[in-house]
Amino acid sequence: MAAVTTDLIRELRERTSAGMMDCKKALEENNADIEKAITWLREKGIAKAAKKAGRETKEGRVVSYIHGNGKIGVLVELNSETDFVSKNEDFEALGKEICMQIAAMNPLYLNEESIPAADLEKEKTIMRSQLEAEGKKADQIEKILPGKIKKYVSEVCLVNQAFFKDDSKTIDDLVKEAIAKFGENITIARFIRFQVGGL
């Protein structure tokens, strides 16, 4: 298998505007063949989604979901570029899927950028203490910590969570697929989850 170098990742990123991790995965899946990686990204809709990511999303809708027992409710603001897309049944279905994800998985934040710095620092401190208690040395801790933080982010941030119906993709992947399908940018603006007896 050919090596995936940073130069290859950079070139693929420049040619497709896809994210660095998406480019790396595309190259790994295609034996470092850049042309096949571009095709792979296009098939996945990632290249298309990345190109549309900068566009403003001024239209949209608020989608709601009440869990069967009536004890959990979710509201999601899902935005699109045009009202044509936001009025589409598939757009509403996407919103429902995201609502059910929130009801089931209870994310605390939308994305990594929305985690308050103090909260992230607190988690890092807890993780460091746990690793020290396990007898890990300082240099080992610094190597282990990024992986633990990534796992934490994938648990508490909606867009990083594995999709509850198909854990081979994240909510971010689900949105990118919708962007490719609709041909315009779609964003999750915010969400709120209510639970009887919860805060």
UniProtKB/Swiss-Prot annotation:
InterPro entries registered for this protein in UniProt: EF-Ts_dimer_sf (IPR036402), Transl_elong_EFTs/EF1B (IPR001816), Transl_elong_EFTs/EF1B_dimer (IPR014039), Transl_elong_Ts_CS (IPR018101), UBA-like_sf (IPR009060)
Subcellular location: Cytoplasm
Coiled coil start-end: none
Annotated region described as Involved in Mg(2+) ion dislocation from EF-Tu, given as residue ranges: 82-85
Gene Ontology terms for molecular function: translation elongation factor activity
GO cellular component, one term: cytoplasm
NCBIfam families reported for this sequence: tsf (TIGR00116)
Family, similarity comment: Belongs to the EF-Ts family.
Role noted for this protein: Associates with the EF-Tu.GDP complex and induces the exchange of GDP to GTP. It remains bound to the aminoacyl-tRNA.EF-Tu.GTP complex up to the GTP hydrolysis stage on the ribosome.
Protein name: Elongation factor Ts
Organism of this sequence: Leptospira interrogans serogroup Icterohaemorrhagiae serovar Lai (strain 56601)
Encoding gene (name): tsf
